[in-house]
Design a protein with these regions (language model features):
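The feature captures the beta-strand-to-loop junction immediately N-terminal to the Walker
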Residues: 37-39
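ABC ATPase nucleotide-binding domains
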Residues: 76-80, 84-231
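Conserved ABC transporter NBD signature motif
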Residues: 60-68
Length: 241
């Protein structure tokens, strides 16, 4: 799996007069899992969509593997995204969902079937290839969505609040699965959540956002033990208030 550093250089995103991301500079180190954490409306999902190419920055630069991708369309960025809603095709089997992206780039059938089966094994869904999404639990559907993203071997893997539709017990299990897969593949991963426990449990680095800017960034232990301001202290955990 390819590894790539992602850099924001003075990224600003405005929607009319509303500033969603305000002059943000940060880096997402190659091969690590970085979480963008913050309350609703803080700019974390907009930042993720800018990396994916689903939104264009108003100003600033995005670098992926030292390549300026600021104006590149999403299809040319070598980035895969796992959405909150899973976004599986209901009329396709599991293996048809997983192999869809490979078919779109004209990989031959024998190769895309083989790669898809290997990827399903990686996400612990071996033997599920002929099932339909409606026959799967929420956690299994999420794993299919992860498999569909990683089968393309992207430079960067993006997650937009992937566990918000799951119950608490399943959330814990699936987040552990995501972290295990990320470490096994070594793919640069950027993960958006508003759940502090989730962020602290799986991340190499956490970037806390508030009001369109970065409130603090660092490893989970440092953020928890040494919050820089009251907002971070309150948001990360009651123990620091």
């Amino acid at each position: 799996m390819k590894k790539a550093e992602v850099k924001f250089e003075n990224i600003t995103k405005k929607f009319n007069e509303t500033v969603a991301v305000d002059n943000v500079s940060c880096s997402f180190e190659a091969g690590t899992l970085t979480t963008l954490l913050g309350p609703s409306g803080c700019g974390k999902t907009t930042s993720l969509r800018i990396i994916a190419g689903l939104e264009r920055a108003t100003s600033g630069k995005i670098l992926v593997d030292n390549e300026d991708v600021t104006i590149l369309p999403a299809t040319d960025r070598d980035v895969s995204m796992v959405f909150q809603s899973y976004a599986l095709f209901p009329h396709m089997s599991v293996i048809e969902n997983v192999s869809y992206g490979l078919k779109m780039i004209n990989v031959n059938k024998e190769e895309y079937i083989q790669k898809s089966l290997e990827t399903l094994k990686l996400v612990n869904l071996e033997g599920y290839e002929n099932r339909m999404p409606s026959e799967l639990s929420g956690g299994q559907q999420q794993r299919v969505a992860v498999a569909r993203a990683i089968v393309l071997e992207p430079k960067v893997l993006l997650f937009d609040e992937p566990l918000s539709n799951l119950d608490a017990k399943l959330r814990r299990q699936v987040r552990e699965d995501i972290r295990e897969i990320q470490q096994k593949l070594g793919v640069t991963t950027i993960y958006v959540t508003h759940d502090q426990e989730e962020a602290l449990a799986i991340s190499d680095k956490v970037i806390v956002m508030n009001n369109a800017v970065i409130a603090q960034e660092g490893n989970p232990k440092d953020l928890y033990n040494f919050p820089k301001n009251k907002f971070v202290a309150n948001f990360i955990g009651d123990a620091n208030v």
